[in-house]
Amino acid sequence: MVTANLPWGKIGFTICFDLRFPELYRNLSKKNLSFIAVPSAFTKFTGQKHWLTLLRARAIENFCYIFAPAQTGRNTPKRETFGHTAIISPDGKILALKKLGKGVIYSKIKPKLSMDLRKIIPSLI
């Protein structure tokens, strides 16, 4: 499990398919993280069904911000990725979303929010 210290908190790193394994995120959150990055290339088919739902679930379960850059567009004649780059808050709100195409998203964040929620709802035991 890879983590890094930032000036405003600790971040963990996962990739794409890792999103389907909640225990990995639980183990990361035990490292006192406030943020998790999930760069991904979900296909259009699975992305439409699961991408935002899984991002929000991992954020809520672990009270972490999720930063999710996502590949978008047709990569080969048979493979199209879903896109939908997102920033999700620790309570599951979609703070920023870029559905398709190149671009940059940003949002105000409250680094303390993760720890505050963990005190209010002590489910990460």
Q: Can you name each region flagged by the protein language model?
A:
Residues 3-5, 87, 106-108:
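Short, well-ordered beta-strand micro-motif
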Residues 20-105:
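CN hydrolase (nitrilase-like) catalytic-core segments centered on the catalytic cysteine
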Residues 1-31, 44-53, 111, 115-125:
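Active-site catalytic loop in hydrolytic enzyme cores
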